[in-house]
Amino acid sequence: MTDKYRIDSHKLLYHVSRVNAWLGGENIYPVYMEISPSGACNHRCTFCGLDFMEYQNRHLDGNVLMERLSEMGALGLKSVMYAGEGEPLLHKRMVEIINHTKKSGIDSAMTTNATLLNEARANAILGAMEWIKVSINAGTSGTYSAIHRTKAADFNTVIGNMSNAVRIRQDNGYKCTLGMQMLLLPENKDEAATLAKLARDIGMDYLVIKPYSQHLLSRTDRYREVKYSDQLCLADTLREFNTGEFSVIFRLRTMKKWDQGERNYARCLALPFWSYMDAGGGIWGCSAYLGNEKFYYGNIYEHSFKEIWEGEKRQKSLKWVHEELDPLQCRVNCRMDEINRYLWELKRPPAHVNFI
């Protein structure tokens, strides 16, 4: 199926100069960062990987965050995805933060449940964003309510909000890509086609169908044993919904990797290229290890990003990861899995690479 955004792969190959600097031993700044503006969430999804963070009612200080965004943009950060431990739109200054991100020269995106993406917010942010991806894990309100553990009416609210977002984008000539995402579970597998049709009909650009991934620290493990080998044929059914303007991105490669549980790399090499900021201002090397001091770099309330990124804590963390961390003990299909596969191959090329 069409995946022009390379969602089932990676895009680091487009950042040749940054990769080359890393290969040359430079202390590069990240290309991408995930930021959690809010620790609170208005849903309690059955599959939530960050439930161990306990949906704390904490929010990043807007002034400090925007100061750091200006700094990070100047240092070379290319993109930010607002998502994290909670629902980003619960942050009262999210509109202002998104617009400041763009002014800082950083591409911004958001993963959201979209219940709070009303017309006013959509009007205020669509012109400043590269993409918005909605987590909507069912094709009917009943199943949606059961999985998101919220009121069934939220389903129609989300559909209405995204329909309005499409209209606002068209009326204003905005370029923001609008998509949806379903995490394929036993409870919703029979509604993937229903959601695909609905997403296409309201004007979404794509629907991602992705596999579950067990977070190492998550309190929920009800889907730990789920396999996708008997669901792969669903790709053929969903392909029928593709048009010139809409595509279903069925993450076949990632599903197979989940079932196999294997990696082709013996070390995590991706950490210099990305970072995670939690809702308390903490900077981490990996979102799969939130709370593990070995991955903690510092806090934006205490230090500038430059001080954190070039600081002793981060250097010790990178050294430990390089020498001791075994990726086989990490989360399967982690955020940086495809990046690691790519970098491992660059570091250990096969024979005959000069015969291009």
Identify the function of each model-found stretch.
Residues 50, 94, 286-287:
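Active-site-flanking alpha-helical
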Residues 54-111, 115-128:
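Conserved Radical SAM active-site core
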Residues 41, 45-48, 97, 101, ...:
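Hydrophobic packing within well-folded, soluble alpha/beta domains
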Residues 52, 84, 136, 211, ...:
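Residues that line or immediately flank small-molecule/substrate-binding pockets and catalytic motifs
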Residues 17, 63, 67, 96, ...:
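Short, contiguous clusters of charged residues that form electrostatic/catalytic patches at enzyme active sites
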Residues 1-56, 70-73, 255-263, 272-274, ...:
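N-terminal pre-core extensions flanking Radical SAM catalytic domains
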Residues 44, 85, 112, 279-280:
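Residue-level recognition of short loop/turn positions
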Residues 1-7, 36, 60, 74, ...:
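Radical SAM enzyme [4Fe-4S]-AdoMet core and its adjacent flexible, acidic
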